[in-house]
Design a protein with these regions (language model features):
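Glycine-centered hinge/linker elements that transmit conformational signals in sensory
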Residues: 166-169, 209-241, 282, 286
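Extracytoplasmic/periplasmic solute-binding protein
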Residues: 127-133, 138, 162-212, 256
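Short, well-ordered beta-strand elements
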Residues: 23-32, 52-57, 80-81, 129, ...
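Short, polar/charged alpha-helical segment
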Residues: 32-53, 141
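Hinge/lid segment of periplasmic solute-binding proteins
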Residues: 85-137, 161-162, 178, 191, ...
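Extracytoplasmic "Venus flytrap"/periplasmic binding protein-like
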Residues: 43-116, 149-151, 250, 254-258, ...
């Protein structure tokens, strides 16, 4: 009996020692649906890597940007893996703020990454500094039943003129239906992401060839006038508080006739477990104004290792798992 007790004690001590010696990765991410799914699958990773534990810091998009930017610029070292956008990667890599992902494993197929996305994550030294968790563009998502009720047919490639007309005709305030839901929450990754893409369709740009700001040009005025009038006439109340997640919830609840936003939303608006209108959703290209330019973007949410992390090998193991083909 004493021998058995001693053996059990030894086993318990070894187990506790194993837990104590495990590295804990602190991962900062955005509170988007796909990242929530990733967190739910964490046990799959830790089962294969029992020497690594994972601690999540999940933040609203604007807060995430502020926190990770402050941390990496000050070399705070709070996070071992950061979720960052395509915009930040080349800039931060050039500053020496990110570690190159040169230890993703022999099985990791870098050539499987879409060239347009991969090039945005590659530094001047041709090394990969972040791996895409997912890439996206933007598109029109709409209620087919409400479009039909309004006596309209959504073109595969709509114009902003059509979108404006359809949004107003689909609006039914008494029934709680907004003709269109668009980002209004302040933030360069919220309303400014949408407005910048939209302005492209109107021929606007931020700077000219001499880096002179162009915000006082008529193309920007046309963009903003259209946006404000459309949101007042056909948008939801409190639109200035709505970003991606808020508009997603409104669309899933059947309160939006149309929504122009990230293509990644398709799986959420068509999932009957989450969406009350899952079987009524159609898709179309982002709108244009006849200039041959559409209001769509190229974006990716990526996983990167800050230079201040002391757990780079474990961090790259996690990134390799989360961005692999098997995942």
């Amino acid at each position: 009996m004493k021998v058995k007790t001693l053996l059990l004690g030894a086993c318990s001590a070894l187990a506790l020692a194993g837990i104590a010696s495990a590295e804990t990765l602190t991962i900062a991410t955005v509170n988007n649906g796909d990242m929530i799914r990733m967190q739910g699958l964490t046990s799959e990773f830790t089962a294969k890597n029992p020497d690594i534990q994972v601690e999540w810091v999940t933040l609203e998009e604007n807060v995430l940007r502020e926190r990770v930017t402050t941390d990496i610029a000050t070399k705070g070292g709070q996070y071992d893996v950061m979720t960052i956008g395509t915009y930040e990667v080349p800039i931060w890599a050039k500053q020496g703020w990110l570690l190159p992902l040169d230890n993703l494993g022999a099985d990791y197929d870098v050539d499987d990454l879409l060239p347009a996305i991969r090039s945005g994550l590659t530094g001047d030294d041709d090394k990969l500094y972040a791996a895409p968790f997912y890439g996206e563009s933007s598109m029109v998502m709409y209620r087919k039943d409400l479009m039909e009720k309004a006596g309209l047919t959504m073109p595969d490639a709509p114009t902003w003129e059509f979108i404006n007309d359809a949004a107003r005709k689909m609006t039914d305030r008494a029934a709680g239906i907004n003709g269109i839901c668009l980002r209004g929450k302040a933030g360069w990754g919220e309303n400014m992401a949408f407005l910048t893409a939209t302005s492209n369709a109107f021929g606007a740009r931020w700077f000219d060839e001499n880096w002179k700001p162009q915000f006082d040009q008529p193309e920007w005025k046309n963009t903003l006038d259209m946006y404000v009038k459309l949101m007042n006439d056909a948008g939801p109340q409190g639109a200035s508080s709505n970003g991606f997640n808020e508009n997603l919830a409104l669309f899933q609840q059947g309160k939006c006739g149309m929504w122009i936003d990230a293509t990644v939303a398709a799986s959420f608006v068509t999932n009957p477990k989450d969406s009350t209108v899952a079987d009524k959703v159609g898709f179309a290209l982002a709108p244009d104004t006849g200039l041959g330019k559409r209001g769509n973007w190229l974006w990716a949410w990526n996983l990167a290792v800050p230079a201040g992390s002391q757990k780079a090998d474990a961090a790259q193991k996690f990134i390799a798992w989360a961005t692999s083909k098997d995942y």
